[in-house]
């Protein structure tokens, strides 16, 4: 991914790792995932640029994607003007009084930071949020038209009905908590630990993504990720992941300081939610105590981000031996996975610890816990009092956001999560031109060529390892704009008068679609982002990249902008995603996507040493006296930023090698490229959200991502940066991995 989790940092990532953009911001969670929602995620046919008890139904058939209709020829018109400034860069957003060599972020973006107010409904604001606002408006038009079309049929009717049901506030108020009552009654009827285990299995959903989107969070007891097998990427494996917390991370339960106050607010939130739902005799204090016990056995974010530690294959029979406590037969039966022979258990100690708690903690405590999470997850689809209470904690207390998003924005997000590709098909027809795709495809080809040249020039790497690296690069497949085939939603029931039911059925539909992959060959044309999603993705287990249509907008990409700015922004994003195939996680996968060591021991030691130096560099960034960037946590994204920007610079020079260097408004091509990079990472954040991101986001804050330039030799003469300035690094201290 390019983006992060809070609206503070949206990052580029890999392997179903959302690299650029963000997972849902806490206060803007997709109602569809019925909580601070998993990633709010989604470029044309993936073109090669080189050479259990499962539901009876198989994965829904996909429909081949059609290219957007060609635009009609029109009379010649004046060349379009860039959206920003005279050549694609917002020079009014600079602070020219700040020396570039002391604080490049302030130099490039200080004026923007000073004049920009964070919208009241956001925890932070940046380039991703800016583009996402436009994408939301464009999507709203599509949904409004579909909802108003009473003669609509097929997918158009489904998206219109889903959106209309969410927008029907009067209908939702009239029903009260009744749509959720069957689930609450089922929880109340649980009579023993076997029934509890089956009920916990029934809550399992495909709501995490370990490698592509680096989305590890679920409030369900465990998360499930269906993806190619680490050791045999021709087939799928189910990955079981720790979960069970209502707050974002273990530190919120175990640390002191502001976390202690947040725990008090969380307990009060739990009590209010249960009272609103009329759940009798529930005990908020013991729910918090149970979640605290779960947090104590959780693996840390850094441990969870370690692929090699996560590659633990368990046979179904191993669960009872290695993780006693939970009735695993009942759990897997409830999850529809009883016939599955093997699993990959990502955090085995946490899974064992959570399982033991099922046996240890009283049944009534678990029933209270399940009831609370059922209501809290559904709050966006229940009367206003529920949604307001959910936002009061997750939006305001946790992230510092004063105002909830307008209902139409929440409806757009919910609709995208439920029917994202059906909406994306219409979005592409309206908002993604063949000209934009062609120019982006050319940029990709230039970036791949430049990255190959950087591999050839890597003096620290042996010929043997270079050969394998070049093979991996040659096998990289890239999708631009939209998927080559569309998902089939015909089996999903959507009713215009059932907002909560629509969300629950969509979530279950997606879960069943995922577990139906087991035993099937891997579909290497499936997309994990929607075209209207502002992000990008590297999929390490398939050696594949995808770039949705929506990210190809200013300030990342502008067809009317100067090429240097486009390469500094979108070119670096593309380079970032390519580089994820060779970062500290991507480097563990070979050209087929298999977890395999293709390095010589000496080369890998040198690679790790360079990574350690970069982690140490980012450890020095301290946005608060008591909080710093965790360089180990952000290392994969930081490697991709350094390599992506360096590759974008080389690709621009390659594309313009036969053209004279032109100065525009006093800026040289090199200056424009680096300013384009910094502009892409302009950002502001509320303190609570900023602090949360430092704990949980694998992307460094945008302010520090922009300072990646200090590792690029060409930046120094471009801005006359001298020894003694704050961002100056001696040549030997500049990290060059690729």
Describe each model-derived feature in a short phrase.
Residues 13, 19-31:
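Short, Lys/Arg-enriched N-terminal segments with co-localized hydrophobic residues
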Residues 59-79:
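Post-signal peptide N-terminal segment of mature Sec-exported envelope proteins
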Residues 78-81, 322-325, 337, 344, ...:
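Intrinsically disordered, low-complexity linker/terminal regions across diverse proteins
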Residues 146-446:
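Noncatalytic, helix-rich "gating/capping" subdomain that lines the substrate-entry/channel surface
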Residues 12, 16, 33-53:
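Gram-negative bacterial Sec-dependent N-terminal signal peptides
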Residues 80-83, 98-171:
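Active-site-surrounding "flap" and adjacent substrate/cofactor-binding loops of secreted or lumenal enzymes
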Residues 77-92:
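Short, Gly/Pro- and small/polar-rich lid/capping loops
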Residues 51-61:
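Bacterial lipoprotein signal-peptidase II cleavage site
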């Amino acid at each position: 991914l390019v983006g992060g989790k809070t609206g503070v940092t949206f990052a580029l990532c890999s392997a179903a790792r959302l690299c650029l953009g963000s997972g849902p911001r806490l206060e803007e969670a997709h109602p569809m995932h019925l909580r601070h929602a998993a990633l709010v995620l989604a470029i044309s046919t993936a073109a090669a640029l080189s050479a259990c008890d499962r539901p009876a139904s198989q994965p829904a058939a996909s429909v081949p994607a059609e290219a957007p209709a060609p635009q009609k020829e029109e009379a010649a018109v004046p060349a379009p003007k860039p959206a920003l400034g005279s050549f694609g860069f917002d020079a009014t957003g600079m602070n020219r009084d700040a020396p570039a060599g002391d604080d490049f972020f302030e130099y490039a973006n200080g004026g923007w930071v000073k004049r920009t107010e964070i919208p009241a409904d956001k925890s932070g604001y940046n380039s991703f949020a800016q583009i996402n606002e436009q994408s939301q408006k464009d999507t709203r038009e599509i949904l409004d038209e579909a909802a108003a079309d009473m003669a609509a049929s097929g997918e158009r009717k489904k998206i219109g009905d889903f959106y209309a049901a969410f927008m029907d506030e009067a209908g939702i108020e009239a029903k009260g908590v009744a749509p959720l009552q069957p689930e609450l009654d089922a929880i109340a009827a649980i009579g023993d630990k076997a029934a509890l285990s089956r009920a916990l299995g029934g809550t399992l959903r495909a709501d995490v993504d370990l490698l592509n989107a680096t989305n590890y969070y679920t409030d369900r007891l465990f998360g499930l990720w269906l993806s190619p097998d680490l050791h045999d990427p021709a087939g799928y494996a189910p990955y079981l992941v720790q979960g069970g917390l209502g707050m974002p991370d273990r530190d919120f339960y175990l640390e002191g300081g502001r976390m202690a106050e947040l725990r008090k607010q969380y307990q009060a939130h739990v009590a209010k939610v249960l009272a609103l739902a009329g759940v009798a005799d529930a005990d908020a204090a013991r729910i918090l105590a149970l979640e605290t016990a779960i947090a104590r056995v959780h693996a840390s974010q850094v441990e969870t981000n370690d692929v090699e530690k996560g590659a633990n294959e368990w046979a179904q029979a191993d669960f009872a031996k290695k993780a006693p406590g939970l009735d695993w037969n009942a759990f897997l039966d409830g999850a529809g996975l009883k016939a599955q022979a093997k699993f990959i258990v990502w955090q085995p100690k946490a899974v064992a610890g959570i399982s033991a708690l099922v046996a240890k903690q009283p049944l009534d405590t678990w029933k209270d816990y399940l009831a609370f999470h059922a209501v809290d997850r559904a709050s966006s689809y229940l009367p206003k009092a529920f949604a307001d209470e959910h936002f009061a904690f997750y939006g305001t207390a946790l992230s510092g956001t004063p105002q909830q998003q307008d209902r139409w924005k929440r409806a757009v997000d919910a609709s995208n999560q439920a029917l994202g590709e059906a909406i994306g098909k219409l979005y592409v027809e309206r908002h993604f031109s063949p000209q934009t795709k062609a120019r982006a495809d050319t940029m990709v080809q230039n970036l791949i060529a430049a990255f190959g040249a950087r591999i050839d020039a890597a003096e620290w790497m042996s010929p043997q390892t270079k050969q394998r690296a070049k093979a991996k690069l040659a096998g990289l497949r890239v999708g631009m704009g939209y998927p080559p085939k569309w998902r089939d939603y015909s089996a999903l029931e959507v009713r215009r008068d059932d907002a909560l039911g629509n969300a629950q059925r969509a979530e279950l539909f997606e879960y069943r679609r995922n577990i139906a992959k087991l035993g099937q060959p891997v579909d290497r044309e499936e997309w994990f982002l929607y075209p209207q999603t502002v992000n990008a993705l590297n999929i390490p287990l398939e050696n594949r990249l995808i770039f949705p249509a929506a990210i190809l907008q200013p300030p990342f990409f502008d067809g009317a902008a100067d090429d240097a700015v486009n390469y500094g922004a979108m070119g670096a994003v593309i380079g970032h995603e390519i580089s994820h195939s060779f970062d500290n996680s991507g480097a563990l996968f070979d050209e087929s996507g298999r977890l395999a060591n293709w390095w010589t021991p000496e080369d890998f030691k040198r690679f790790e040493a360079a990574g350690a130096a970069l982690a140490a560099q980012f450890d020095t960034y301290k946005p608060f006296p008591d909080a710093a960037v965790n360089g180990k946590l952000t290392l994969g994204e930081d490697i991709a930023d350094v390599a992506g920007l360096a590759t974008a610079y080389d690709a621009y020079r390659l594309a313009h090698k036969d053209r004279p260097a032109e100065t525009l408004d006093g800026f040289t091509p090199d200056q424009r490229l680096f300013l384009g990079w910094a502009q892409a990472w302009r950002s502001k954040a509320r303190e609570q959200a900023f602090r949360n991101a430092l704990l949980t986001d694998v992307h460094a804050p945008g302010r520090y991502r922009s300072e990646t330039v200090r590792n690029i030799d060409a930046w120094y003469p471009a801005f006359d940066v001298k020894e003694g300035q704050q961002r100056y690094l001696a040549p030997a201290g500049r990290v060059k991995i690729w």
